[in-house]
Amino acid sequence: MVKVICDSTGDIRDLAKEYDISLIPLNVLFGEESYEDGVTITPEEFYKRLVTDSRHPTTSAPAPGQFVELYKKLAKETDEIVVLTISAGLSATHESALQAKELIGNLCKVEVVDSKMTCGGLGLPALKAARAAKKGDSLKDIVAMLNDALPRIRAYMIFDTL
């Protein structure tokens, strides 16, 4: 069965286990303090810090080595993985996933898909991919479904302030 990886910006932490989706966290930085999104800082803690901390948070992509570790772990269960990432235009996460794919060689087949979005625009296709994997769809079919669906998905955000 195809395994699905989504980065933490997809905001599906509560559904990931149910759908057998592996999450890879981006790093959240408040000044010199670094946290793994959804692992060492919860969304609730993040939003509280956003209001109370004078330092503007930044993010950084997972290192290729983090993807390599996850690919190797999943390769013990499958020989096919699909990875959905935050937009390559917003983060280096997509590039890290591609570098890791090269680093593992022929250990397993990995397809990295740029969602060209974040938040629900990334999380919903990841859930759709996981459902397709569970029913036995091939990696090729899942990637084709994602490439068909992603251009038709829109995500909107509203901010109190910039």
Language-model segment annotations:
Residues K3-A63:
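N-terminal glycine-rich anion-binding loop in soluble enzyme alpha/beta folds
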Residues T9-G10, V28, I86, S115-M117:
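Short, ordered loop/turn segments at secondary-structure junctions
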Residues V51, A126-K134:
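Regular secondary-structure segments
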Residues T52-S96, V143, L150-P151:
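Glycine-rich phosphate- or other oxyanion-binding loops that anchor nucleotides, phosphorylated ligands
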Residues E80-S87, E111-D114, K128:
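Short glycine-rich or small-residue beta-strand-to-loop segments that form or flank ligand, phosphate
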Residues T85-G105, G123-L127:
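Short Gly/Thr/Asp-enriched flexible loops that form oxyanion-binding sites at enzyme active sites
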Residues K101-G121, K134, S138-V143:
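Short, acidic/small-residue loops that bind anionic groups at enzyme active sites
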Residues R131-L162:
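Internal, active-site/partner-interface "lid" segment
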